[in-house]
Amino acid sequence: MKLSSIIEFPHISLRDIRPRHIRLSIVDLLAVLLFCMLGICYIQHPSEVADVEFYKIATVALAYSVARIAISQSPKYIGWLLLAATVVWCCHEAILGLMQVFGSRMSNHFLYACTGTFFNPGPFGGFLAVCLSMLAASFTITKSKVWHCVAGVSIFIVVVILPSTMSRSGLLGLAASMAVLAFTIEKWRNFIRKYWYAVLLVSIVAGTGAYLFKKNSANGRMFMNKISVQAMVGNGFTGAGLGMYTGVYGQQQHDYFASQIEIGNGDIDISAINERERMACDCPERSFNEYLGIGVEAGPVAMVLFVAIVVLAMVRLLKQKSPFAYGLITLAVFAIFSYPFDIPEFQIMLAIFLAFGATTEGNGNVASTSVAVMSVFLLGWLFANQHSAQKHRAWAEGEWSKTEYWYGQEFYNYVVEDGDSLMPNLKHNYRFLFEYGQSLNKEGQYAKSDSVLMLGESISSDPMFWNVMGNNSLACDRYREAEERYRRAFIMVPNRLYPLCLLAKLYDAEGDTARFLNISSQIDNFKAKVETANTEKLRGEIAEIKSRYTDK
């Protein structure tokens, strides 16, 4: 008996593993074009945050190239190997999530019971949904009884924990991929055609329930998409630069609400702002829509190109009846509502899915193995070059995590001392820039604080940068500049009370009675998005100042 007949995966043998040429596909060509466009964007808009983003892009490109070469040599063998790895990986995550739910292990987020190895239940749920869709598809495609047992047990474990993540976007992605899978099975296809009205009704009810479950969050995401589209249009074909999404978003949101306030009455007429949008807005840390995020940072052409790559890979995988098609569908839908491509696990998944989608057995242009290997070495050199700088950034992040203790204890002189040395490697970290800038403010170094905070506000949508810069101006007796900065902070996110209170205190310091009384009356009637003990404290402080005016 030959060795190749003993060592077998379902439907494959060692005969399938043989050197092959790599046939280039349209997916490969579009991927190269997209990489070149992102590289041009990186060169046109250089910054520290762009360095970080391009490192991620280089990682995905390298993973895609390596996977593409490996898969082209033996698609079936590599496919089953990766499905087996998926079983191990997702079962490990699911079991860890169950242990977190039952309290035997701690989650990675103090607000949520289960996160797996992730730091948030959203990505955790999305990861499980992607794995579940692949396992379910492989269960229906293969006839192996052994695989049915393995996949069936894995599916059961994942289904048990998935609802605990409360990831609506993950469940929506899973529903989309399972709907496509159902249409490939004749029995289910006939059922859907016969009872389409019932399927439609159930879909509408489920969609409405998902919306109402977290209505405020859903409204916020829709408003974010609206502002993102405006920002993408405003930045033209070249985009704003890699990693600049949040800074551009904050600017665009400010301009949007400023245009409404300008047609109102008085300095800040809150009634002129659309109330639903006022309560829906926030200062996001990520795009929560990967496609619009690419459009804002690299331009609409890059966004369309990326969508085309994903869709083409998806179609090719569906034609091949590959279970990875359903993983890609789930991931693609999940990316509309979340930020998977910021997370290494999803970056690797995306690279592998696209590599499978690009692999073809048919006719096509043949690339020599030497050219393919040279491409990998070139990308490897680029990755290594970026990785060196990334190591310095990672070291600085670790040092800063120790220094943050002093920030929490209000030992600002220690923060400033360490911040000076860490600044060159942490210009991409807006949290560091804010805390370092505020510490400089507390230490009376107002000009230096301004320069640090200005750098931070360019990569963040958080209005707190402008509040602290307003405090810098106030400390230097530049009242009009302080007023403009406080106003900007409020208009950026007009559901926060703090900037209005700073404005009121500014007018009180100036002795401007009329403007103080006007802004204090607005504070009395102001509805904040989140009412806390702190908002009540702020109202109490303004009421105490106001009492001095009414007692006169």
Positions of PLM-derived features:
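Transmembrane signal-anchor hairpin modules in multi-pass inner-membrane enzymes, especially those
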Residues: 1-88, 138-150, 179-197, 360-406, ...
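Alpha-helical transmembrane segments of multi-pass inner-membrane proteins
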Residues: 2-6, 28, 32-43, 51-69, ...
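Interfacial juxtamembrane loops and adjacent helix segments
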Residues: 105-111, 242-296
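Flexible juxtamembrane loops connecting transmembrane helices in multi-pass membrane enzymes
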Residues: 113-114, 177-178, 202-236, 240-243, ...
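Hydrophobic/aromatic packing residues within the alpha-helices of TPR/SEL1-like helical repeat arrays
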Residues: 412, 419-420, 453, 486, ...
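Conserved structural position within tetratricopeptide repeats
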Residues: 424, 454-458, 488-491, 525
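Alpha-solenoid helical repeat scaffolds
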Residues: 431-435, 464-468, 497-502, 532-537
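TPR/TPR-like (Sel1-like) alpha-helical repeat modules
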Residues: 488-491, 497, 501-531
